[in-house]
Curated annotation (Swiss-Prot):
Family statement: Belongs to the NmU family.
Signal peptide: 1-26
Keyword Signal: yes
Name of the protein in question: Neuromedin-S
The keyword Iron appears for this protein: no
Recorded name of the encoding gene: Nms
Amino acid sequence: MKHPLPHYSPILFIYCFCMLQIPSSGASPPLADSPDGLDIVDPERLAYFLKQREIHSNQPKENQDVYKRFLFHYSRTRKPTHPVSAEFAPVHPLMRLAAKLASRRMKRLPRLLRLDSRMATVDFPKKDPTTSLGRPFFLFRPRNGRYTDNNFQ
């Protein structure tokens, strides 16, 4: 393995030469720019910057307050407004309404077929008798694998 110093020696020499300060007449040159390269800041811009910084520093606190209010409001358990059966999990009221409408449609369908004698009754074959468990075909399909029963009105 070669030593890296001979390869970098010209670069090191140029770097040291550029960093070397050559003494001048002893008086410092007049400053064209402000010291340390800093620009003179307009007081209005400084006030605007400080105001924006204060606004952004308060934002995490506001977000935390909103989060606390959200948790306080939604983490409390509420008593249901409807009677809940022990055998069924609580569902959204619209899901309950849809099940009622489906059962109402099923009750109304045979009556409509009897009133209109010209309509032919159609028997729908079931694909697999084990999947229906003795229930008729559904006009409303519940979600999450739950069955619609008329017991939980």
